[in-house]
C-alpha cells in the first residue's frame, strides 16, 4: 500500500517518502512461492515520476526553512535554550526532510537512514556547495556551539540551488 501510494499516487511524506519503494526495487528475492514479490518489483520498476519529485519538494522544503514551524528555526530555539534533547529531535526531523528533498531533486529513491551522506556524495548529480563540510560542521557543533547551528538554514540546506532545474 505504501509503495502504491508513493510510486503510483505520487503522495509525499515528511521524510523517507520513497524508502519502501527503494527497498522493493533493490531487495534480493530469496523465496517467493507465488511470485508476488517479483510481480511487485516489475510493477514498480519505473522511472522516477516528476509528479512525485515535485510533491516531495513542495511538502518538505517549507519544513527546512522559511515557514512556520520550519525546523531550522526550531533547532535554533532549542539550542538557544540549551535543550539538547530537542536539538537532537529537531535535527533528526530536519535531516529526514532534507534528504527526502535531496534524493527527489536527483530523481533517486531514498535508500533509508544508513550511509545517506556517502550515497548522496557518490550518486547525486546535484549537491549543495560544501556538502560534506557543512554536515561535518553541523555534527561537530550541534551540542556545543549554538551560533553555528544558527546557520543551518543557509549553509547546510542550500538545496534551493537545485530547485530551478525542476520549477
What are these regions (language model features)?
Residues 1-79:
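Conserved NTP/Mg2+-binding pocket subregion across the NTase superfamily
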Residues 63-70, 93, 97, 130, ...:
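Charged, amphipathic alpha-helical oligomerization/scaffolding segments
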Residues 73-76, 80, 99-110, 114, ...:
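Charged/polar positions within long, soluble alpha-helices
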Residues 107-136:
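Short, charged amphipathic alpha-helical segments flanked by flexible coils
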Residues 126-167:
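Terminal (often C-terminal) interaction modules
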